[in-house]
Amino acid sequence: MEITFLGTSSGVPTRSRNVSSVALRLPQRAEVWLFDCGEGTQHQLLRSDVKISQITRIFITHMHGDHIYGLMGLLASCGLAGNAQDIEIYGPPDLIDYLKACAKYSQVKLSHRVRVYGVRPGILYEDEEFTVSCGLLKHRIPAFGYRIAEKNRPGRFDVEKATALGIPPGPIYGQLKRGEVVTLPDGRRINGKDLCGETETGRKVIYCTDTVFCDGAVELAQDGDVLIHEATFAHQDAQLAFDRLHSTSTMAAQVALIAGVKQLIMTHFSPRYAPGNVLQLDDLLAEAKAIFANTILARDFMTYEVPRLRRKTE
C-alpha cells in the first residue's frame, strides 16, 4: 500500500500545492483508489508516477469544490483515452446529481462504465483483501471520512516441512494453510498453524477531511496505521477553525493520540502559512508533534509506503 499526495492545499491551489486529492496505490492488484478529486487532479496525476489507467475506485468526502471540481474532467479524459477499466465512485448522495448535470450540460459521453454510490456510515465495500467503511465527520455540509482496512494474510505455508511429515499434497494443504487442525489417514492430528510462518497483519489507512475535531474521526481512526487528517489552521487560529468547521494542527494530533494510530500525516493546509508569512507550516508541525510525535506534513507528490507488520501465528 502506497499513498501518493496529489494535492495538499485547502480551498485554492498555490504555486507549490494543488487542492485535495490522495492516491492509494495497491501494486499487488495493479489498482489505484483515489480520495477526493479537486480541480487539476488529472494534471497532478500526469506529473506523478500514478497511472490513471489503474484507477478503479474514487471516494469523495464532501461536495465542496476544492474536492470535486476535477472529477468530471478526469472521467472524461479516461473516456477519451479509451480506458476500458470500470470505475466505481463513492460519495455524498448529491454527488450523483452533480455528475449527471456535468455530463448533461457538457455533453460528455463516457466510453467506460461508471457506477456512483451514495454513501451512509458503515461498510461500503468488501472483497477478499479489503474492507472500506465510512463515518460522518463534522463540517458545514455533510462530509465523510474513509477507513481502508486490509485483511490479515496467513503466513507462508512450509511445503518442505509438510512433505517431511509425510502429509500428502491435495485439498488438505488448503485446510492447513488456513490454520485448521487436520486428522491424517494414519490418525495423526496436524495443526496447520505449526506449518505456517508469521501472519501478515492487515494495514489500516484513514482519510479524514474536511472536519473540525469530532468523535466520528476518532472512532474511524481507531488503531490505524496511517491517519491522513486535515490541518487547515494553526492552533492560534483555532477560532477560525471552529467558525469554519475545520481542524487545527493540534486537533489533528489529538485525534491521532486518542485513536492510537501509528502515524499521522497532516494535509489540507491554508495558504496563509506559505513561506514568507509569520506563521509557517513548520510551526504547525511543531504544534502537532508536541501532542503526537509521529507526525509529518504532506506535500504534493510525496509518497508514503505503509509498512507491513508480522506476528507469529499462535
From Swiss-Prot:
It is an enzyme of class 3 (hydrolase). Keywords: Endonuclease, Hydrolase, Metal-binding, Nuclease, tRNA processing, Zinc. Coiled coil: none annotated. The active site is at 66 (proton acceptor). GO terms for molecular function: 3'-tRNA processing endoribonuclease activity; zinc ion binding. Its EC number is 3.1.26.11. Belongs to the RNase Z family. NCBIfam families: PRK00055.1-3, RNase_Z. Homodimer. This is Ribonuclease Z. It comes from Rippkaea orientalis (strain PCC 8801 / RF-1) (Cyanothece sp. (strain PCC 8801)). The gene is rnz.
